[in-house]
Curated annotation (Swiss-Prot):
Role noted for this protein: Involved in DNA repair and in homologous recombination. Binds and assemble on single-stranded DNA to form a nucleoprotein filament. Hydrolyzes ATP in a ssDNA-dependent manner and promotes DNA strand exchange between homologous DNA molecules.
A Pfam family annotated for this UniProt entry: HHH_5
Listed SMART domains: AAA (SM00382)
UniProt-recorded name of the protein: DNA repair and recombination protein RadA
């Protein structure tokens, strides 16, 4: 390749790297027909393909060899095809955004708030404050950055019919936001099954592309999976399906710079005689899938305790907060 052509290629490469939403048909090896098939399955852009698995694309294009070529081309265009230095990773982490929880002590525990490009799991018993925290985050993300938000919208997937717009309005009013506008900035969907839940996550990608969305809530992530796959005989199938769902959430968070918050139920350990007999549901799939894991528990009256019990770099610790009419406060 001549120096001129090489330079032109580098310029073209750079232009694509800052435009991950380039139409999928611009990819090498993807024409109009293949592009139409990919779009039918939700792969609209170079970014969508770059974060997909070869197996997913093979189901669309017909074979794994061609799927691998397309995925590698997309990743190369976005600069995701090779190793980078740890310093580059560090510099990239500096661009991660955080959403304040509205509770100063909890923000400090989390290193500044809920991170984008990560999945934060919130586990705890019924009434421990999981859904309350989700409601508050859906409001907090709308605040300007100087007040702890990102000036953005939220997507809320409700699996247990616990979303209450009235609660959003209370919290929004307490934070100085117009209650009606706060509701208008939340894209809500009720999931009626695990399949429906996973479809909604796929649909969320289109909403994120077309709107300034920085938060995706799934409350709760495990409910439908537990009810649809009861008993040990169905456990393997359940975990396999749950694994795909969590992987989709992780990819979405990273690809679109979104904070993903999932709530989780608890289960009893009958063989535990000392300490807390409860543990988060979902087994190793959620344990390894979530980036950060919070445990909420009740204390006296309206006080709740939040403990971070799994994190790549946060030390374990716990703080208390109160649930009031205005929302969660120190």
């Amino acid at each position: 390749m001549s120096s001129r052509k090489k330079k032109d290629a580098e310029v073209a490469q750079a232009s694509v790297e800052v435009n991950p939403d380039l139409d999928v048909e611009e990819l090498e090896g993807v024409g109009r027909v293949t592009g139409a098939k990919l779009k039918e399955r939700g792969f609209f852009t170079v970014r969508d393909v770059a974060f997909a698995s070869v197996k997913e694309l093979a189901e669309v294009v017909g074979n794994e060899e061609r799927a691998l070529q397309i995925v590698e081309a997309a990743r190369k265009m976005l600069g995701l095809h090779s190793f980078v230095s740890a310093l580059e990773v560090y510099e990239r982490r500096k661009t991660i955004r955080r959403i304040s929880t509205g509770v100063k002590a909890l923000d400090e525990l989390l290193g500044g708030g809920i991170e984008t490009r990560a999945v934060t799991e919130v586990a705890g018993e019924f009434g421990s404050g999981k859904t309350q925290l989700c409601h508050q985050l859906a409001v907090m993300v709308q605040l300007p950055e100087e007040r702890g938000g990102l000036g953005a919208k939220a997507i809320y997937i409700d699996t247990e019919n616990t979303f209450r717009p009235e609660r959003i309005m209370q919290i929004a009013k307490a934070r100085g936001l117009d209650p009606d506008q706060a509701l208008n900035n939340i894209f809500y969907a009720r999931a009626y099954s695990s399949d429906h839940q996973m479809i909604l996550v796929d649909q969320a990608k289109s909403i994120i592309k077309q709107n300034n969305v920085a938060l995706l809530v799934v409350d709760s992530v495990i409910a439908h999976f537990r009810s649809e796959f009861p008993g040990r005989e169905n456990l393997a199938e359940r975990q396999q399906k749950l694994n795909k769902h969590v992987a989709d959430l992780l990819r979405l968070a990273d690809a679109y710079d979104v904070a993903v918050v999932i709530t989780n139920q608890v289960m009893a350990q009958p063989d535990v005689f000392f300490g807390n007999p409860l543990r988060p549901a979902g087994g190793n799939i959620l344990a390894h899938g979530a980036t950060y894991r919070l445990w909420l528990r009740k204390s006296k009256e309206n006080i709740r305790i939040a403990k971070i019990f799994d994190s790549p770099y946060h030390p374990e610790g716990e703080v208390s907060f109160r649930i009031t009419e205005e929302g969660l406060v120190d």
